[in-house]
């Protein structure tokens, strides 16, 4: 898959530094990408909107880099990430779910419970259940336990594998 994105495709009207860091994150070598992810995350709120727009437009591999930057941006990213979880397809939703688990904000619990109940993708459901376990909210944990009872040991194994890897 092509990971490269042209500078003109990164359409942030604001800060040139944000544009340059997003470009470096998406196009740099591993070290450069990780440095850019850290720098973007440290900027907090100003990077959330441009990163969410990027999450919605780049290929699958690049989405995980964007999700890492959003997770590092912290609680300012929760509501926009919840919005992605509610409307996006699984390829975009999965990195957003991971980022929400990394942030650890309980505002994500109800939307994640909804995703666990409605997603048709076993991968998405397993990642969502792992995120709910990581968040540690009693309502989320209860929903995961209910899902384990309905789905069996195989699904529980996938969830625990995802949980231990997050």
List the predicted regions and their residue ranges:
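Short terminal alpha-helical segments
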Residues: 19-25
